[in-house]
């Protein structure tokens, strides 16, 4: 097999396109590492069926594929129109009325499903409808009515989203539907659970408590899509530290903070998440044109490549695989771009946290292993023998061109590490401990074709294989 492994992972969204023509198997075979189930669409039965199919195919192909359940979150939308759609011109007066019923909207007014909107806005605020395609300036608020003037005109149809420029809408991050979907996530046994529109760390802590109460021990993903989540370093850190994974959800975030600010925020989020030992997913419109075209645009290629250069763990596909005409081709194209970007030498340079003091032995071992790996001539791989996947995560926070093999007896741990940049999960179960187990792990990787005789490898492990958090040893071994 090729000695070169793709380091950046691919998250693919399931939907009607992956339900037909054996596309799900094709998508996983093409390189999907994580599948996303969007709880905004479909029934619990649909999600359970898809999850079962993913696990069946992954086992058949000998892959470890993580399952991510994505909660819908609060959807702040206009209601519906009598004719289904209206066209608003610049200068038109337009009323958002929280008391107006469904199907009563027209060119002068429409209902809103978020009844707290009038309390969240003041004259002068800019409301962005349909991802900013239509923009309204608030003139006055009277009771449950928000009087506005159209500043950017265009068509407006049923159930389009509402954002406030600069953020500040106070809708709670978890709805009753989300709480029901957490039960579904627990039933399915998702590996990751994504929380939409969190305002602060406490929203994520609340989601984690609800998940635990439901019997779901999934890692929590913070979808960063509100302006207040990135308004300063403290707000950003609050979100990151309360999560296990950060998703740079560029759609709603870009609408709220403005597209020109998005580039810097993406880079800052990725950099800070890595510093705080969190994984990162970069999402939204990464290969949007491939919904209907068999090849990506040059701009999309550059977007994916730049996310790789930023240090993201994973790049995500949404409608491209859920509803597109070329789901497996899109995954294959994204994989090629990732591999191309990973050839650039600068992404393997690391400062190794030389100015940081570590809080625990596990992190110290992970960092020392990576320092040795990047500075000892001839090292070809890092092997982390792990119960929880934590050591694999921490080693992957340090930039390196070397593969990291997460070796565990636990299927869930292997699925979790499928998301981490540069980490290849490999099932390994041994009754031995210490150096005997280390040699067994090295021999297994050699037999699988990942290593060859004479390779120099670095192994991290604990004294006892079955104890979580016990990593305390680094070994340097030569493959026999």
UniProtKB/Swiss-Prot annotation:
Could you tell me the superkingdom of the organism this chain comes from? Bacteria
A single GO BP term for this record reads:
glycolytic process
Q: Where does K(+) bind?
A: 38, 40, 70
Q: Which family does it belong to?
A: Belongs to the pyruvate kinase family.
What is the protein name for this chain?
Pyruvate kinase II
Which PANTHER family does the record associate with it?
PYRUVATE KINASE (PTHR11817)
Q: Which SUPFAM superfamilies match?
A: Phosphoenolpyruvate/pyruvate domain, PK beta-barrel domain-like, PK C-terminal domain-like
InterPro entries for the chain: Pyr_Knase, Pyrv/PenolPyrv_kinase-like_dom, Pyrv_kinase-like_dom_sf, Pyrv_Knase-like_insert_dom_sf, Pyrv_Knase_AS, Pyrv_Knase_brl, Pyrv_Knase_C, Pyrv_Knase_C_sf
Cofactors needed by this protein, per the record, are: Mg(2+); K(+)
Q: How does it assemble?
A: Homotetramer.
Annotated metabolic or biological route of this protein: Carbohydrate degradation; glycolysis; pyruvate from D-glyceraldehyde 3-phosphate: step 5/5
Question: Which residues are recorded as binding Mg(2+)?
Answer: 225, 252
Q: What class of enzyme is it?
A: transferase
Record's function text = Catalyzes the formation of pyruvate in the last step of glycolysis, it is irreversible under physiological conditions. The reaction is critical for the control of metabolic flux in the second part of glycolysis.
Q: Where is this site: Transition state stabilizer?
A: 223
What would be one Gene Ontology cellular-component term for the protein? cytoplasm
One GO term in the molecular function aspect is:
ATP binding
Which keywords describe this protein according to UniProt? Allosteric enzyme, ATP-binding, Glycolysis, Kinase, Magnesium, Metal-binding, Nucleotide-binding, Pyruvate, Transferase
Q: Which Gene3D superfamilies match?
A: Phosphoenolpyruvate-binding domains (3.20.20.60), PK beta-barrel domain-like (2.40.33.10), Pyruvate kinase, C-terminal domain (3.40.1380.20)
- Give residues annotated as binding substrate: 36, 223, 251-252, 284
Q: Does the keyword Repressor apply?
A: no
PROSITE patterns, per the entry: PYRUVATE_KINASE
EC id:
2.7.1.40
Q: Which reaction does it catalyse?
A: pyruvate + ATP = phosphoenolpyruvate + ADP + H(+)
Q: How is the activity of this protein governed by pH, according to its UniProt record?
A: Optimum pH is 4.0-6.8.
Please report any disulfide bonds recorded for this protein chain, giving both cysteine positions.
none
């Amino acid at each position: 097999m090729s000695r070169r492994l793709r380091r950046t992972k691919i998250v693919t969204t399931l939907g009607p396109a992956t339900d037909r023509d054996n596309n799900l198997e094709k998508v996983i075979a093409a390189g999907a590492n994580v599948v996303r189930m969007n709880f905004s669409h479909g029934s619990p039965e649909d999600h359970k069926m898809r999850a079962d199919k993913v696990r069946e195919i992954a086992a058949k192909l000998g892959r470890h594929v993580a399952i991510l359940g994505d909660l819908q979150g609060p959807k702040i939308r206009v209601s519906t129109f009598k004719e289904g759609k209206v066209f608003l011109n610049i200068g038109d007066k337009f009323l958002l009325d929280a008391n107006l019923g469904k199907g009563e909207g027209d060119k002068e007014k429409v209902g809103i499903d978020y009844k707290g909107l009038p309390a969240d806005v003041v004259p002068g605020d800019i409301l962005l409808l349909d991802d900013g395609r239509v923009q309204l300036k608030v003139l006055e608020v009277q009771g449950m009515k928000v009087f506005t003037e159209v500043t950017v005109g265009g068509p407006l149809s049923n159930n389009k989203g509402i954002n406030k420029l600069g953020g500040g809408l106070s809708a709670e991050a978890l709805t009753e539907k989300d709480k029901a979907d957490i039960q579904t996530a627990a039933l399915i046994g998702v590996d990751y659970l994504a929380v939409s529109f969190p305002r602060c760390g406490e929203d994520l802590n609340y989601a984690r408590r609800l998940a635990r109460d439901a019997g779901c021990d999934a890692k929590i993903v913070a979808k960063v899509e509100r302006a207040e989540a990135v308004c300063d370093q403290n707000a950003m850190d609050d979100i990151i530290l309360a999560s296990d994974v950060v998703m740079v959800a560029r759609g709603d975030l870009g609408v709220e903070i403005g597209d020109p600010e998005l580039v810097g925020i993406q880079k800052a989020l990725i950099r800070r998440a890595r510093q705080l030992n969190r994984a990162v997913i970069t999402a939204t419109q990464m290969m949007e044109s491939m919904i209907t075209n068999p090849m990506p645009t040059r701009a999309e290629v550059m977007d994916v490549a730049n996310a790789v250069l930023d240090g993201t763990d994973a790049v995500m596909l949404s409608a491209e695989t859920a509803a597109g005409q070329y789901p497996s081709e899109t995954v294959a194209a994204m994989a090629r771009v990732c591999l191309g970007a990973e050839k650039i030498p600068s992404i393997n340079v690391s400062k190794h946290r030389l100015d940081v003091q570590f809080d625990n032995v596990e992190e110290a071992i992970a960092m020392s292993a990576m320092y040795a790996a990047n500075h000892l001539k001839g090292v070809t791989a890092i092997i982390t023998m792990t119960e929880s996947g934590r050591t694999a995560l921490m080693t992957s926070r340090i930039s390196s061109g070397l593969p990291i093999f997460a070796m565990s007896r636990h299927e869930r741990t292997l699925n979790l590490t499928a998301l981490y940049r540069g980490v290849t999960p490999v099932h390994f179960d041994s009754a031995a401990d210490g150096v005997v187990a280390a040699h067994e792990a090295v021999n297994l990787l050699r037999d699988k074709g990942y290593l060859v005789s004479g390779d120099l490898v670095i192994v991290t492990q604990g004294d006892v294989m079955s104890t979580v958090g016990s990593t305390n040893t680094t070994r340097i071994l030569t493959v026999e």
